[in-house]
Amino acid sequence: MLPRLVLAVCLFSCTLTGWAQQLTGRVLAASSGRPVAFATVGIKGKALGSTADERGHFAFAVPATLSGTDSVVISCIGFRALRLTVGQLRAPETVWRLQPQAQTLGDVQVRHPKLKPAIIGRKAVGGLAYWSARDTSLNVASDERGREMLTVLPVRRSCYVDSFRFHVERNDFKLIRFRFTLYQITSGRPTRELLTDDIQFTLLSQQTGWVSLDLSAYNIRLRKGQTVAAGIQWLQSEKLDPKNAVLGGTAAFPSVGHRVLVRSKSEAQWRSYPFNMSMYLAVQEFK
């Protein structure tokens, strides 16, 4: 038997070495004044940022040398992204208000009776590769929040999405909260978020196996010929061991024609890897 290849992707790990400053603030909805729970905050083009907590508060560490003119993006599905600078974010106890995103009312979609169940993605489990999300951070200001992992999926027939599933082989966490993400792919990179609802779900303590998220209520329709990327964004977690925790699973490698996209924070650069995770969309496609 061939030995399993451990891919050194380091999807969710970081360190505080040489970092001397925390950026803090709070995110509220401009219309209601309520907290925007789990809004993302990221430094444009850099692996720096975090997510807000349930009360809209955020905090994350940055190098003392970070320029005050670097761009910051605060965003959440359902709201218009707010763009500012690191210099503005350095002001203490600042509140940032997000404006609601104008929603275009589309036609009511009635599912065609001639539909059949299908899978877009990889339903098999196992492979020569092993992906892992490792958190060795001792400080909530510099943890794995805001990081994303997606699988690229070509849509061969128009369809409605019933559910999203991915397989977990190891889980050392007491709880993990994720956001389901779905992007339009252009020239190999995510270009547009396709969801108008903020869809979140949780993994319970040491939960492994197939994780399933029911999406049938959201009426998500994909078009024939479209390429999308579906996956997860890490919002919040609690470790069983405060010093170390790992979330991991298997993947097919090498996988010709398949790609996984990863970025370490919400505004970091995307990285592409030639492996195929056990992650898929269950759909009802047109015959």
Where in this protein do the model-derived segments appear?
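Aromatic- and Gly/Pro-enriched, solvent-exposed loop/edge beta-strand patches characteristic
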Residues: I176-F253
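Short Pro-Gly-centered beta-turn/loop motif in secreted/extracellular proteins
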Residues: F60-T69, I220-R223
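Beta-sheet-rich sandwich/jelly-roll-like modules and their strand-loop junctions
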Residues: T104-I185, Q233-K287
